């Protein structure tokens, strides 16, 4: 008599998918409160799995973006400092920026006009003037799964070299700084490195 071995991982996944059917909310109405070149900000009503209705629920769409953990040939990490309106403070963070789209808008179903790696190379060059031939994709993840539908893609760039000058967008006002690994660790511990996705990027990139 032959026995078929069951893959426990597959079984658990199937059980999870079945259970998830009882967790999903159904969006039953949507109002676009703000819809301009920068954001699609919505007010929605959702139906719980048990039939109750919850409203309002606010969410938004913006374009996907990239974060680059970049280091130079001396092993120092290339960062930028700029003002962040949400917390109304100047923060230290890694070079980052949006993936370009064919229609130039921040949201919608229009296809991106560049791959994420192309976007990362462009953003690093535009913000810092540095370029690299050593790139590694670390992770693509929702930037804020609770209220947004865009994704952040994290890259590691090593042995970066100065290849040109900054070419900043009209909305960018920033300065370039270099830090050692220990200095970045200290800034994170002391709450001076305040972009959550950038802290995650650092943890992914350590030792790589």
Question: Language model features by range: what are they?
Answer:
Residues 45-50, 144-163:
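Active-site-adjacent beta-strand/loop module that shapes the phosphate/pyrophosphate-binding cleft
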Residues 3-5, 17-18, 22-25, 90, ...:
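Nudix hydrolase/Nudix homology domain
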Residues 62, 67-69, 76-122, 168-171:
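Conserved Nudix-box catalytic region and its N-terminal flanking loop in Nudix hydrolases
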Residues 41-43, 69, 79, 154-156, ...:
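Conserved hydrophobic/aromatic beta-strand scaffold that supports enzyme active sites
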Residues 31-67, 73, 82:
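Acidic, metal-coordinating catalytic segment for phosphate/diphosphate chemistry
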Residues 4-21, 104-111:
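Intrinsically disordered, low-complexity terminal tails and inter-domain linkers enriched
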Residues 131, 135-136, 142-144:
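Acidic/glycine-rich phosphate/pyrophosphate-binding loops and surrounding catalytic core
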């Amino acid at each position: 008599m032959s026995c078929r071995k069951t893959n426990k991982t597959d079984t658990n996944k199937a059980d999870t998918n079945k259970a998830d059917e009882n967790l999903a909310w159904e969006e039953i109405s949507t109002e676009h409160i703000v819809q301009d070149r920068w954001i699609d900000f919505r007010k929605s009503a959702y139906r719980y799995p048990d039939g109750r209705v919850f409203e309002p629920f606010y969410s938004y769409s913006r374009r996907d973006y990239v974060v680059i953990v970049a280091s130079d040939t001396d092993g120092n990490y290339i960062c930028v400092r700029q003002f962040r309106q949400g917390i109304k403070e100047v923060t230290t963070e890694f070079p980052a920026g949006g993936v370009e789209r064919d229609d130039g808008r921040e949201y919608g179903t229009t296809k991106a006009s560049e791959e994420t790696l192309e976007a990362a190379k462009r953003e690093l060059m535009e913000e810092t003037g540095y370029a690299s031939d050593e790139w590694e994709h670390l992770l693509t993840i929702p930037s804020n799964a609770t209220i947004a539908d865009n994704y952040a893609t994290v890259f590691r760039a090593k042995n970066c070299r100065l290849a040109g000058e900054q070419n900043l967008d009209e909305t960018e006002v920033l300065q370039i700084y270099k830090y050692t690994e220990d200095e970045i660790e200290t800034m994170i511990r002391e709450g001076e490195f305040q972009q959550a996705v950038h802290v995650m990027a650092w943890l992914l990139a350590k030792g790589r």
